[in-house]
Amino acid sequence: VTSKLNGAPIPADSDSLILAMNGGKPMAPKLMYEFPRAAMNLELKRGRNFVPQFLDKTYRDIKYTRSAIHNWLAEWKPQYVVDINRDTQLQDSYADEEHILIVGVARISASQFRFKLYQYDGKEYFEIEQQDVYPNLPILFKPMGTPRPQSNYIASDADYVDYITELMGGFAIPDFLKQHRKDKKYLLLGLPLNRDSERMVMSDITYAANEHRGWFLRKNPTDKEKRFADKLGFELIEADCKDFLEQLQTRKVA
């Protein structure tokens, strides 16, 4: 996935996000360990608005080519998708279809909840309350945020601490989703789980899933990822998105 303007790849992992946020320069090794840690450092130095402004510029203002996996999702249109990326490609995949959007938020005093709820009517988003959710619509869950329709992100260490605390307390998942997610199985694609933040978020979001929680596609998984998959009940498949799409294409042709 690259910028339509200059061909630069979209920042899609921790290292590339840190480099983009810091003007292409690496940060100290302890800060390069994980994006939230680096984001916290720059937030303390440059103010709380710095990181959201960077993410807006990166994911709202720059237009990118489409990824193959999102083209497949646009064709398949599953009823429930969790996307921990902060770009808008998943939302673009559902741009011609009504859906519910759940966006994670953090460090707010106006509400005890750590999410915003929107309904998309085929043209635009409008904010709704939990009791107004139409449960038969597809559900897009963006726990780490999105610039659309309103910029909200979980990015720095402080964001993650607040969000995960409320996630564990039940305040980051809408009530209707707590019911909807029961006994589900998940397919984890393009999601490294070698950092504590992502593991904690996914562990709680997939709570109440089927005993066989699903499938975790990861080439060259770390020992931590193997233990995580085994502990939660994910079947580990040593493959990546490209392998997955090639297998789908092979079956389609057959």
Kindly give the residue locations of the regions a language model identified.
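SIR2/sirtuin NAD+-dependent deacylase catalytic core
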Residues: 1-254
